[in-house]
A protein has these predicted regions:
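Domain-level signature for proteins that mediate thiol-based redox and metal-cofactor handling
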Residues: 1-99
């Protein structure tokens, strides 16, 4: 079975930013997924450079994606370009968080 980008995004919905209580996909923190199976690269950002949960979020992303069938290596690529902003959140996240 081969996986698609959508499968990776769906798997990442279980990874939450504990400060905001929302998943990294709805928060707009996952900028992209590149599949070169068995390697998956996740390009992502955090809500701030000083995010205390950054290492935990990165580890959880690696763990959940590496559990997908066909994935042998997960690379996480933290970027600050473009900088994250609340406008990147899904409409549901904006509603829940009052934006």
């Amino acid at each position: 079975m081969s996986i698609a980008e959508e499968d990776v995004f769906e798997a990442l919905r279980v990874v939450e930013d504990p400060e905001l209580g929302m998943d990294v996909v709805d928060l707009g923190l996952v900028y992209g997924v590149q599949l070169e199976l068995p390697k998956v690269t996740i390009t992502y950002s955090l809500t701030s450079m000083g995010c205390p949960a950054g290492a935990m979020i990165q580890e959880q992303m690696r763990d959940v994606v590496s559990s997908l069938e066909g994935v042998g290596e997960v690379v996480t690529d933290l970027t600050w370009t473009p900088p994250w902003s609340p406008e990147m959140m899904s409409d549901d996240a904006k509603f829940v968080l009052g934006f």
